[in-house]
Each structure stands twice: as structure tokens, then as C-alpha cells.
Amino acid sequence: MKSVKFLLPLLLLCAVLFCGCTGKEEKKIDEVVKRELDLLKHLDSDTTQKYISYQEIFPGDLEDAAMSSDIEEVFSLFFQDFDYKILDTSVNRNKAIAKVSLRLFTLDARALAEDFSKALLKHEIALAASDDTEDDQTVTLEDRYMLLNQLLSSNKYQTVERNCSITLTASEKNEETIWEIKRTTTLENDLVGGLMNYLSDPDILSPEDTLLVYLDTLKNMSTEELANYLNADSIVSTEDPNKISLANALVEQVHNIFNYSIGETSVSGYHASVKADITTFDSEAILN
């Protein structure tokens, strides 16, 4: 009985000491996370690039472009309303690993990705309608960030919440435990509100939205742009000025009366069919 009475205070003391050490370590870990995420809140460019590479936002683009002020501005605009809240911190001292659960507050990345996909499609159509055939019509990484910049500058996106976890690893330096955030693709995607996943989603736009962007872009082209896009010169394939005038007149006719309405959509696997009524000139009547 005396042994039990002696052991109980000892065990209680050990438990208190362990909890105290663990609490101290959790506080240190929280401070590391706060320090890094506060730099994102304060639009620190170096910290942004540490966790979110501007090239990895568009992983399919292999272009190695220099980090420009325009690209930096995109991240500044994106993170201007960024915030976070630490929910829980757990430490595994044996494995020198810690995990911090967070709630992130970011702009609505899905809405931004939808707008970007529409803007990119318009940009690609505009390139095809350009009369400067010597220019490379490939969409560059800088073009993509230019579009993001325009969207973030001209639109106000809602703030959304997202839960995520951050893993930290420990190392010993001068008999002191140093905690460091482990950079992962998942963390990168979480910090930008899922933007990386949304931008790579081929279904981010519905079939009808895709067709709507396409037809609306055609409808709003100038006569010259429409002629370039339709390759009007190939309609007559001749130097005859009368036939060239006819081709130009046809393009002018399309430009004046072109209209559309979109109907039902059916989707089967990777294929979609969208019904649309197109208003244009009566080609049969002209040819006859």
C-alpha cells in the first residue's frame, strides 16, 4: 500500500512534466507555421515562391519563363485576403514528425479557374483570328499569368474556407530541435485554395459553356478578325478581284447577321453533344 502511495505522485509528476514538454514543443511548432503563413498574408514574394512555384500552377507548361513583376502581382492579388486558423497540433517526438491541422481562408479558386478557362479559350480564338501570321500563336506561360492578372484585377471573388494539414519534420542543431514545414504538392494546392487542381480539370467548363464562349467570341469579332478566322481568302482561291469582293461580302454578311441560341446538352463518357440554332446567310440561295 505504501508503494502505491509513493508511485502515484511520481507517475503524476512524470505526466505533468511530459505534458509540459509536449505543450512547449507544440507552441514552438505553431510559431513556425504562423511565421511562414503570416509572410504569405503579408504578400512576401520569397515565401510565396518557397511554397508555390509559379511554374507549378500550370504544370503542363514546360516553358522556363523568368519571374516577372506581372507574375509577382498575380500572387499578391491572390493572397491579399488570405488568412488561416490553427485547429490542432500533434507531435510524434519518436519519429520527429508533427502535424498541424488548419482552416484556410482563400478566394474562390474554382470560380477563378472557370473564368480563366473561358478567358483562355477566347484568347486562343483571338490568336487564330490574328492577321499577323508571322507571330507564334502558342499560348505562353506569361500569357496565362496575364489572363490571371486581368481577372484578379477586374473581379472580386468571394472568400471560401478549406481545411488542410501541414506536416513538419524535426532536426537537431546545436542541441536544439528545429522544426521545418515539409513542402508537398498537396500543400501547394491547398494554399491556393485548390487552384492547381481546378486549372487542370478538363471538365471545369460544361459543354454548353464551352460552346457559348466559342460562339460569343465569334459574334463579337470585327469583320477583319472574322475573315481571318474563317480564312476567307481560301473561299475563292483566285486573284480575280470580283470573286475576292464576293468573299469579303459573304464575310460581311456573316458578321452582320450571325446569331445563335443554345439548346439541350447530352453527355456520354468523354463525348458531349450540344444542340444549337445558328443564324447565318443562306449559302444555297447565294450559290444558286
Predicted regions and their residues:
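Bacterial N-terminal signal peptides that target proteins for export
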Residues: 1-8
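C-terminal motif of bacterial Sec signal peptides marking the signal peptidase cleavage site
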Residues: 17-20
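Core segments of small alpha/beta cavity-forming domains
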Residues: 23-81, 193-253, 260
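Surface-exposed, charged secondary-structure patches
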Residues: 69-153, 246-288
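Short beta-strand edge/turn micro-motifs at domain boundaries
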Residues: 118-202, 288
